[in-house]
Amino acid sequence: MGKAVIAIHGGAGAISRAQMSLQQELRYIEALSAIVETGQKMLEAGESALDVVTEAVRLLEECPLFNAGIGAVFTRDETHELDACVMDGNTLKAGAVAGVSHLRNPVLAARLVMEQSPHVMMIGEGAENFAFARGMERVSPEIFSTSLRYEQLLAARKEGATVLDHSGAPLDEKQKMGTVGAVALDLDGNLAAATSTGGMTNKLPGRVGDSPLVGAGCYANNASVAVSCTGTGEVFIRALAAYDIAALMDYGGLSLAEACERVVMEKLPALGGSGGLIAIDHEGNVALPFNTEGMYRAWGYAGDTPTTGIYREKGDTVATQ
Protein backbone atom coordinates (compact mmCIF):
# COMPACT_ATOMS: atom_id res chain seq x y z
CA MET A 1 0.00 0.00 0.00
CA GLY A 2 1.13 3.54 -0.73
CA LYS A 3 0.17 6.82 0.83
CA ALA A 4 -3.14 7.59 2.47
CA VAL A 5 -5.60 9.48 0.27
CA ILE A 6 -8.99 11.21 0.38
CA ALA A 7 -11.49 12.22 -2.32
CA ILE A 8 -14.71 14.21 -1.97
CA HIS A 9 -17.57 15.32 -4.21
CA GLY A 10 -20.25 17.96 -4.00
CA GLY A 11 -22.60 16.81 -6.73
CA ALA A 12 -22.57 16.28 -10.50
CA GLY A 13 -24.57 17.86 -13.30
CA ALA A 14 -24.74 20.14 -16.32
CA ILE A 15 -22.15 22.56 -15.03
CA SER A 16 -21.37 25.22 -17.62
CA ARG A 17 -18.38 27.55 -17.56
CA ALA A 18 -20.51 30.14 -19.34
CA GLN A 19 -23.03 30.17 -16.50
CA MET A 20 -20.57 30.47 -13.63
CA SER A 21 -18.56 33.56 -12.75
CA LEU A 22 -14.96 33.35 -11.61
CA GLN A 23 -16.08 34.41 -8.14
CA GLN A 24 -18.59 31.58 -7.99
CA GLU A 25 -15.99 29.08 -9.18
CA LEU A 26 -13.58 30.22 -6.50
CA ARG A 27 -16.18 29.76 -3.76
CA TYR A 28 -16.60 26.11 -4.71
CA ILE A 29 -12.89 25.49 -5.25
CA GLU A 30 -11.95 27.08 -1.93
CA ALA A 31 -14.56 25.07 -0.04
CA LEU A 32 -13.56 21.77 -1.65
CA SER A 33 -9.84 22.44 -1.16
CA ALA A 34 -10.23 23.33 2.50
CA ILE A 35 -12.21 20.19 3.25
CA VAL A 36 -9.74 17.91 1.46
CA GLU A 37 -6.85 19.59 3.27
CA THR A 38 -8.54 18.85 6.59
CA GLY A 39 -8.87 15.21 5.58
CA GLN A 40 -5.26 15.03 4.42
CA LYS A 41 -4.02 16.38 7.75
CA MET A 42 -6.15 13.85 9.62
CA LEU A 43 -4.73 11.02 7.51
CA GLU A 44 -1.16 12.25 8.04
CA ALA A 45 -1.83 12.21 11.78
CA GLY A 46 -2.80 8.56 11.57
CA GLU A 47 -6.55 8.99 11.97
CA SER A 48 -8.84 6.32 10.56
CA ALA A 49 -10.45 6.48 7.14
CA LEU A 50 -13.83 6.23 8.87
CA ASP A 51 -13.15 9.32 10.98
CA VAL A 52 -11.81 11.18 7.96
CA VAL A 53 -14.83 10.58 5.71
CA THR A 54 -17.22 11.34 8.56
CA GLU A 55 -15.55 14.68 9.22
CA ALA A 56 -15.27 15.55 5.53
CA VAL A 57 -18.98 14.96 4.98
CA ARG A 58 -19.85 16.85 8.17
CA LEU A 59 -17.96 19.84 6.78
CA LEU A 60 -19.77 19.50 3.45
CA GLU A 61 -23.07 19.43 5.36
CA GLU A 62 -22.06 22.68 7.05
CA CYS A 63 -21.40 24.42 3.71
CA PRO A 64 -24.54 26.00 2.16
CA LEU A 65 -23.09 25.65 -1.34
CA PHE A 66 -24.01 21.98 -1.34
CA ASN A 67 -27.30 20.09 -1.03
CA ALA A 68 -26.71 18.38 2.31
CA GLY A 69 -27.33 19.70 5.80
CA ILE A 70 -27.35 23.50 5.73
CA GLY A 71 -28.46 24.50 2.24
CA ALA A 72 -30.55 21.37 1.68
CA VAL A 73 -33.38 21.56 -0.84
CA PHE A 74 -37.09 21.70 -0.02
CA THR A 75 -39.68 18.97 -0.43
CA ARG A 76 -43.04 19.65 -2.07
CA ASP A 77 -44.41 20.48 1.39
CA GLU A 78 -41.67 23.07 2.06
CA THR A 79 -39.92 20.79 4.53
CA HIS A 80 -36.44 19.28 4.63
CA GLU A 81 -35.78 15.53 4.70
CA LEU A 82 -32.13 14.54 4.92
CA ASP A 83 -30.39 11.21 4.33
CA ALA A 84 -26.86 9.95 5.06
CA CYS A 85 -24.76 6.79 5.19
CA VAL A 86 -21.32 5.72 6.40
CA MET A 87 -19.52 2.41 5.81
CA ASP A 88 -16.32 0.96 7.27
CA GLY A 89 -14.40 -1.10 4.73
CA ASN A 90 -12.47 -2.91 7.45
CA THR A 91 -15.46 -4.41 9.27
CA LEU A 92 -18.15 -3.98 6.58
CA LYS A 93 -20.25 -2.30 9.25
CA ALA A 94 -22.51 0.49 8.06
CA GLY A 95 -25.00 2.99 9.42
CA ALA A 96 -27.60 5.16 7.74
CA VAL A 97 -30.45 7.55 8.46
CA ALA A 98 -33.20 8.71 6.11
CA GLY A 99 -35.93 11.32 6.24
CA VAL A 100 -34.53 13.23 9.21
CA SER A 101 -35.39 16.90 9.71
CA HIS A 102 -34.07 17.92 13.12
CA LEU A 103 -30.45 16.73 13.04
CA ARG A 104 -27.86 19.28 11.96
CA ASN A 105 -25.42 16.64 10.71
CA PRO A 106 -27.10 13.48 9.44
CA VAL A 107 -23.73 11.83 8.81
CA LEU A 108 -23.04 11.89 12.55
CA ALA A 109 -26.39 10.23 13.20
CA ALA A 110 -25.54 7.57 10.62
CA ARG A 111 -22.29 6.94 12.47
CA LEU A 112 -24.22 6.52 15.72
CA VAL A 113 -26.53 3.98 14.10
CA MET A 114 -23.49 2.01 12.98
CA GLU A 115 -21.66 2.11 16.29
CA GLN A 116 -24.37 2.25 18.94
CA SER A 117 -27.23 0.17 17.57
CA PRO A 118 -27.71 -3.35 16.20
CA HIS A 119 -29.20 -1.84 13.04
CA VAL A 120 -27.92 -0.52 9.72
CA MET A 121 -30.65 2.00 8.83
CA MET A 122 -33.11 4.06 10.85
CA ILE A 123 -35.63 6.55 9.50
CA GLY A 124 -37.62 9.61 10.45
CA GLU A 125 -38.66 10.33 14.01
CA GLY A 126 -37.25 7.06 15.30
CA ALA A 127 -33.82 7.87 13.92
CA GLU A 128 -33.98 11.35 15.39
CA ASN A 129 -35.01 10.14 18.85
CA PHE A 130 -32.21 7.57 18.75
CA ALA A 131 -29.71 10.33 18.00
CA PHE A 132 -31.14 12.72 20.60
CA ALA A 133 -30.83 10.02 23.27
CA ARG A 134 -27.14 9.75 22.44
CA GLY A 135 -26.31 13.42 22.70
CA MET A 136 -27.14 14.93 19.34
CA GLU A 137 -28.87 18.29 19.52
CA ARG A 138 -32.39 18.82 18.23
CA VAL A 139 -32.41 21.71 15.78
CA SER A 140 -35.12 23.59 13.94
CA PRO A 141 -35.42 22.58 10.28
CA GLU A 142 -35.19 26.29 9.49
CA ILE A 143 -31.40 26.11 9.88
CA PHE A 144 -31.24 24.16 6.63
CA SER A 145 -33.22 26.76 4.68
CA THR A 146 -31.71 29.32 2.34
CA SER A 147 -33.47 31.87 0.16
CA LEU A 148 -31.90 30.34 -2.95
CA ARG A 149 -33.31 26.89 -2.19
CA TYR A 150 -36.77 28.35 -1.60
CA GLU A 151 -36.63 30.21 -4.90
CA GLN A 152 -35.70 26.94 -6.57
CA LEU A 153 -38.70 25.22 -5.02
CA LEU A 154 -41.03 27.93 -6.32
CA ALA A 155 -39.49 27.64 -9.78
CA ALA A 156 -39.89 23.85 -9.74
CA ARG A 157 -43.53 24.19 -8.71
CA LYS A 158 -44.14 26.65 -11.53
CA GLU A 159 -42.70 24.17 -14.00
CA GLY A 160 -44.60 21.32 -12.41
CA ALA A 161 -41.33 19.48 -12.05
CA THR A 162 -39.40 17.46 -9.56
CA VAL A 163 -35.74 18.32 -10.05
CA LEU A 164 -32.63 16.69 -8.73
CA ASP A 165 -31.33 19.83 -7.10
CA HIS A 166 -32.01 23.51 -7.61
CA SER A 167 -32.70 25.67 -10.64
CA GLY A 168 -30.94 28.84 -11.65
CA ALA A 169 -27.41 30.15 -12.02
CA PRO A 170 -24.66 29.10 -11.85
CA LEU A 171 -25.84 25.70 -13.07
CA ASP A 172 -28.50 24.16 -15.22
CA GLU A 173 -29.82 22.89 -11.95
CA LYS A 174 -32.58 20.72 -13.39
CA GLN A 175 -29.75 18.36 -14.24
CA LYS A 176 -27.64 18.84 -11.13
CA MET A 177 -27.40 16.00 -8.65
CA GLY A 178 -27.32 17.34 -5.13
CA THR A 179 -25.32 14.99 -2.96
CA VAL A 180 -22.03 15.16 -1.09
CA GLY A 181 -19.64 12.36 -0.28
CA ALA A 182 -16.16 11.30 0.76
CA VAL A 183 -13.97 8.21 0.42
CA ALA A 184 -10.59 7.59 2.02
CA LEU A 185 -7.75 5.11 2.47
CA ASP A 186 -5.79 5.46 5.72
CA LEU A 187 -2.24 4.56 6.73
CA ASP A 188 -3.40 1.19 8.04
CA GLY A 189 -4.86 0.26 4.66
CA ASN A 190 -8.48 0.68 5.70
CA LEU A 191 -11.10 2.11 3.37
CA ALA A 192 -14.28 4.02 4.27
CA ALA A 193 -17.06 5.91 2.51
CA ALA A 194 -19.75 8.41 3.49
CA THR A 195 -22.58 10.06 1.56
CA SER A 196 -25.17 12.70 2.54
CA THR A 197 -27.97 14.56 0.75
CA GLY A 198 -31.00 16.79 1.01
CA GLY A 199 -32.63 14.89 -1.84
CA MET A 200 -34.56 16.40 -4.75
CA THR A 201 -36.19 19.81 -5.00
CA ASN A 202 -39.99 19.45 -4.89
CA LYS A 203 -39.74 15.74 -4.07
CA LEU A 204 -42.67 13.96 -2.47
CA PRO A 205 -42.26 13.77 1.32
CA GLY A 206 -40.99 10.33 2.22
CA ARG A 207 -38.92 9.86 -0.94
CA VAL A 208 -35.52 8.27 -0.33
CA GLY A 209 -32.82 8.05 -2.97
CA ASP A 210 -29.59 6.11 -3.24
CA SER A 211 -27.46 8.16 -0.82
CA PRO A 212 -28.31 6.31 2.43
CA LEU A 213 -28.52 2.88 0.81
CA VAL A 214 -25.51 0.61 1.25
CA GLY A 215 -24.44 -0.65 -2.16
CA ALA A 216 -26.41 1.95 -4.09
CA GLY A 217 -24.97 5.33 -3.12
CA CYS A 218 -22.31 4.29 -0.62
CA TYR A 219 -20.04 1.27 -0.22
CA ALA A 220 -16.64 0.35 1.22
CA ASN A 221 -14.72 -2.92 1.42
CA ASN A 222 -11.02 -3.21 2.20
CA ALA A 223 -10.75 -6.04 -0.32
CA SER A 224 -11.63 -3.77 -3.20
CA VAL A 225 -12.87 -0.20 -3.08
CA ALA A 226 -14.68 2.66 -1.34
CA VAL A 227 -17.35 4.48 -3.37
CA SER A 228 -19.67 7.48 -2.93
CA CYS A 229 -22.19 8.30 -5.66
CA THR A 230 -24.09 11.34 -6.90
CA GLY A 231 -26.79 11.25 -9.54
CA THR A 232 -30.30 10.16 -10.43
CA GLY A 233 -30.93 8.26 -7.23
CA GLU A 234 -33.66 5.96 -8.45
CA VAL A 235 -31.42 4.66 -11.23
CA PHE A 236 -28.41 4.28 -8.93
CA ILE A 237 -30.61 2.16 -6.65
CA ARG A 238 -31.76 -0.07 -9.50
CA ALA A 239 -28.18 -0.45 -10.72
CA LEU A 240 -26.65 -0.95 -7.26
CA ALA A 241 -24.04 1.43 -8.62
CA ALA A 242 -21.62 1.60 -5.70
CA TYR A 243 -21.51 -2.15 -5.11
CA ASP A 244 -21.29 -2.84 -8.83
CA ILE A 245 -17.89 -1.14 -8.89
CA ALA A 246 -16.67 -3.55 -6.20
CA ALA A 247 -18.28 -6.58 -7.86
CA LEU A 248 -16.69 -5.85 -11.23
CA MET A 249 -13.31 -5.60 -9.51
CA ASP A 250 -13.78 -8.64 -7.25
CA TYR A 251 -15.48 -11.04 -9.62
CA GLY A 252 -14.73 -9.60 -13.03
CA GLY A 253 -11.08 -8.82 -12.49
CA LEU A 254 -11.49 -5.26 -13.74
CA SER A 255 -9.25 -2.43 -12.61
CA LEU A 256 -10.74 0.54 -10.78
CA ALA A 257 -10.66 2.60 -13.97
CA GLU A 258 -12.30 -0.16 -16.01
CA ALA A 259 -15.03 -0.78 -13.45
CA CYS A 260 -15.85 2.93 -13.24
CA GLU A 261 -15.98 3.22 -17.02
CA ARG A 262 -18.36 0.27 -17.23
CA VAL A 263 -20.75 1.53 -14.57
CA VAL A 264 -20.74 5.30 -15.09
CA MET A 265 -20.34 5.47 -18.86
CA GLU A 266 -22.26 2.34 -19.91
CA LYS A 267 -24.56 0.75 -17.32
CA LEU A 268 -26.09 3.86 -15.78
CA PRO A 269 -26.78 5.68 -19.07
CA ALA A 270 -28.43 2.52 -20.40
CA LEU A 271 -31.00 2.88 -17.60
CA GLY A 272 -31.37 6.63 -18.10
CA GLY A 273 -29.06 7.51 -15.22
CA SER A 274 -26.75 10.50 -15.10
CA GLY A 275 -24.24 11.54 -12.48
CA GLY A 276 -20.92 10.34 -11.20
CA LEU A 277 -19.00 8.90 -8.29
CA ILE A 278 -15.72 9.03 -6.43
CA ALA A 279 -13.78 5.87 -5.63
CA ILE A 280 -10.50 4.78 -4.04
CA ASP A 281 -9.28 1.20 -4.33
CA HIS A 282 -7.28 -0.79 -1.80
CA GLU A 283 -4.04 0.15 -3.57
CA GLY A 284 -4.70 3.87 -3.30
CA ASN A 285 -5.75 4.54 -6.87
CA VAL A 286 -8.38 7.26 -7.25
CA ALA A 287 -11.23 7.54 -9.77
CA LEU A 288 -13.65 10.44 -10.20
CA PRO A 289 -15.80 9.54 -13.23
CA PHE A 290 -19.00 11.31 -14.28
CA ASN A 291 -21.20 11.25 -17.36
CA THR A 292 -22.51 14.79 -16.91
CA GLU A 293 -20.84 18.06 -17.92
CA GLY A 294 -19.22 18.43 -14.54
CA MET A 295 -18.88 17.32 -10.93
CA TYR A 296 -17.68 19.28 -7.93
CA ARG A 297 -14.73 17.23 -6.74
CA ALA A 298 -11.38 17.28 -4.97
CA TRP A 299 -8.81 14.74 -3.87
CA GLY A 300 -5.29 14.44 -2.54
CA TYR A 301 -2.73 12.07 -1.11
CA ALA A 302 -1.51 12.83 2.41
CA GLY A 303 1.21 15.46 2.21
CA ASP A 304 0.37 16.55 -1.34
CA THR A 305 -1.41 19.63 -2.67
CA PRO A 306 -5.13 18.98 -3.22
CA THR A 307 -6.45 18.68 -6.76
CA THR A 308 -9.86 20.22 -7.42
CA GLY A 309 -12.22 20.23 -10.38
CA ILE A 310 -15.64 21.37 -11.51
CA TYR A 311 -15.81 20.85 -15.26
CA ARG A 312 -14.81 17.95 -17.44
CA GLU A 313 -11.05 17.99 -17.94
CA LYS A 314 -9.08 15.68 -20.19
CA GLY A 315 -7.39 12.90 -18.25
CA ASP A 316 -8.71 13.88 -14.83
CA THR A 317 -11.04 11.00 -14.11
CA VAL A 318 -8.47 8.54 -12.78
CA ALA A 319 -5.33 9.15 -10.74
CA THR A 320 -2.68 6.59 -9.84
CA GLN A 321 -0.28 7.16 -7.00
Swiss-Prot record:
UniProt record, GO biological process: protein autoprocessing
SUPFAM superfamilies per the UniProt record, alphabetical: N-terminal nucleophile aminohydrolases (Ntn hydrolases)
Protein's UniProt keywords contain Aminoacyl-tRNA synthetase: no
The keyword S-adenosyl-L-methionine is annotated on this UniProt entry: no
Induction behaviour: Repressed by cysteine, an effect that is attributed to CysB.
Site note Cleavage, residues: 178-179
Residues binding substrate: 207-210, 230-233
GO MF term set: asparaginase activity; beta-aspartyl-peptidase activity; hydrolase activity
Source species, domain of life: Bacteria
Subunit comment: Heterotetramer of two alpha and two beta chains arranged as a dimer of alpha/beta heterodimers.
Protein's name according to its UniProt entry: Isoaspartyl peptidase
Highest classification ranks of the organism: Bacteria, Pseudomonadati, Pseudomonadota, Gammaproteobacteria, Enterobacterales
